[in-house]
Amino acid sequence: MALDRGTLTRADLSEEVHREIGLSRADSAAVVEQVLEHMCLALARGENVKISGFGSFILREKGQRIGRNPKTGVEVPIAPRRVLTFRASQMLRDRIVSGN
């Protein structure tokens, strides 16, 4: 089970869909892959992804800034970039705190 490893994988999600909904293992894997693919495509297009009761994957633009090489102390420009952040919903945060 995923809790034994500490990491939930695609295979674990597919197996849960198979057990809970009763789809074949192949169909369950296809459903999981399609959901993840749609999420990835939306993010690649610059869209945020919000899953009610779970959380939001939010794209943010970071501007150029000056960083510093920790070994030499030399200032180095860091190019602007797009970063992905995740914000858990209040419902998910409450479930994590309560442990169920």
From Swiss-Prot:
Its Gene Ontology biological processes? DNA recombination; positive regulation of metabolic process; regulation of DNA-templated transcription; regulation of translation
What is this protein identified as? Integration host factor subunit alpha
Q: How does this chain assemble?
A: Heterodimer of an alpha and a beta chain.
**What job does this protein perform?**
This protein is one of the two subunits of integration host factor, a specific DNA-binding protein that functions in genetic recombination as well as in transcriptional and translational control.
* GO MF annotations, alphabetized: DNA binding; structural constituent of chromatin
What keywords tag this UniProt record? DNA recombination, DNA-binding, Transcription, Transcription regulation, Translation regulation
Asked if the Swiss-Prot or TrEMBL record annotates the protein with the keyword DNA-binding, the reply is yes
Family annotation (InterPro entries)? Hist_DNA-bd, Histone-like_DNA-bd_CS, IHF-like_DNA-bd_dom_sf, IHF_alpha
> What Pfam families does this protein map onto?
Bac_DNA_binding
Can you tell me which family this protein belongs to?
Belongs to the bacterial histone-like protein family.
Q: Name one GO cellular component term.
A: cytosol
Q: Does the keyword Transcription apply?
A: yes
